Amino acid sequence: MAKESSFDIVSKVELPEVQNAIQTALKEIGTRYDFKGSKSSITLEGDELVLVSDDEFKMNQLKDVLVGKLIKRNVPTKNIEYSKLENASGGTVRQRGKLVQGIDKENAKKINNLIKKSGLKVKSQVQDDQVRVTGKNKDDLQQIIAMVREADLPIDVQFINFR
């Protein structure tokens, strides 16, 4: 009997890469003319980004710079959920961005349904914050990977533990 192959579908954000992106974004903000004298800053508190700027316009520019740096470092920007803008001290505005780690139940169900609708001979099961896909044919598994990549999911997914 053929050995079963498997892989895991996960959704992770590499925190060291986020920290590096923040450092390069802060460096760029320090040299940009439109940020001269601005109280703009970006910090990482646990798994949450905290952006502080003078006003809403500068906040949007700050986010654009940060997103550009995150993309260069291959950090999925889909996995950042921003809160509403709030007033901070000193006439500044603050916005928090939560870094989503893992696949929640709702998205795991979407992935499971997508795999079941494919009609391929594979099994999928939800394990905590990841989805494991097993099957005898490696070609079927590769088709599942391609299909999940093409799917319009609200989170970014990675594929690990190929066996």
UniProtKB/Swiss-Prot annotation:
SUPFAM superfamilies: YajQ-like. It holds the Pfam family DUF520. Keywords: Nucleotide-binding. Belongs to the YajQ family. GO terms for molecular function: nucleotide binding. Nucleotide-binding protein. NCBIfam families: PRK05412.1. The keyword Nucleotide-binding applies. PANTHER family: UPF0234 PROTEIN YAJQ. Gene3D superfamilies: 3.30.70.860, YajQ-like, domain 2. This is Nucleotide-binding protein BLi01194. One of its GO terms (cellular component) is cytosol. InterPro entries: DUF520, UPF0234-like_C, UPF0234_N, YajQ-like_sf.
